[in-house]
């Protein structure tokens, strides 16, 4: 869990940017982005938020969060792969240079100079991934039809159920216990590598993620080689956690654990 006090201790006169996740994809901790942004802006620091895990699971109000940039991965919102969204404040998007050149993003090209198109064209070089964009539009409408409040309520109930279930399972250790938690539940089994856990569970039709989850430094701090992660979505049920628990017991039996 990351607190405002911890962030403040890390800030030095050299700090220019705070880059932080909105929802940890290991512990599920929901980070207080609004408060961190207020602190950062009071010191002239830019805030960049990794919202890939936050966007599908949390209600977003960018004016309220007030961060400078917020990145989203579309496939985590039941959309297509190969597509992302970057929200940015207009003043920064106008000031920063484009990272890539190509058709559609320039205004005028001369031998000795170049001028770029207006936003958002300036950052969208070349042929757009039209099919993916159209598909993602439908994904957003799908989520809106359900209601993000309903998504959050459903996932919170599932995570609470899963936590209580796995807490009772000997040899299973849950990773992190944040006060505010999203739809992620990571764990380890004493004496069993997470890759072996995932393989055995896969044989039972239980799909989890095993590894560092793009967070090697966090795992190093936790002094574990990796972790197994169960993530919930709108399609999951409590019965899925029952099946997960049964498969974990099968895994323990294979490794002669009680």
List each model region and its residues:
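Pyridoxal 5′-phosphate
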Residues: 1-258
């Amino acid at each position: 869990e990351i607190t405002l006090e911890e962030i403040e201790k890390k800030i030095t006169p050299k700090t220019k940017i705070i880059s932080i996740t909105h929802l940890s994809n290991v512990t599920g901790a929901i980070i207080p982005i609004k408060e961190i942004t207020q602190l950062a802006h009071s010191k002239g620091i830019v805030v960049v938020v990794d919202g890939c895990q936050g966007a599908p699971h949390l209600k977003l109000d960018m004016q309220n969060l007030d961060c400078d940039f917020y990145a989203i991965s579309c496939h985590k919102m039941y959309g297509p792969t190969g597509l992302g969204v970057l929200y940015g404040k207009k003043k920064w998007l106008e000031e920063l240079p484009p990272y890539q050149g190509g058709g559609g993003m320039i205004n005028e090209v001369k031998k000795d100079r170049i001028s770029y198109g207006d936003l958002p064209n300036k950052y969208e070089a070349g042929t757009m991934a039209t099919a993916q964009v159209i598909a993602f539009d439908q994904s957003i409408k799908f989520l809106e039809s359900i209601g993000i409040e309903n998504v959050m309520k459903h996932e919170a109930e599932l995570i609470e159920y899963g936590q209580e279930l796995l807490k009772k399972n000997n040899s299973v250790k849950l990773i992190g216990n944040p006060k505010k938690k999203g739809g992620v539940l990571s764990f380890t089994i004493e004496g069993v590598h997470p890759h072996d856990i995932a393989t055995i569970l896969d044989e039972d039709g239980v799909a989890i993620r095993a590894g560092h989850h793009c967070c090697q430094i966090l795992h190093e701090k936790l002094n574990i080689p990796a972790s197994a992660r169960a993530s919930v979505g709108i399609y999951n049920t409590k019965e899925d956690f029952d099946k997960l628990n049964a498969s974990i017991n099968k895994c323990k039996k294979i490794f002669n654990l009680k």
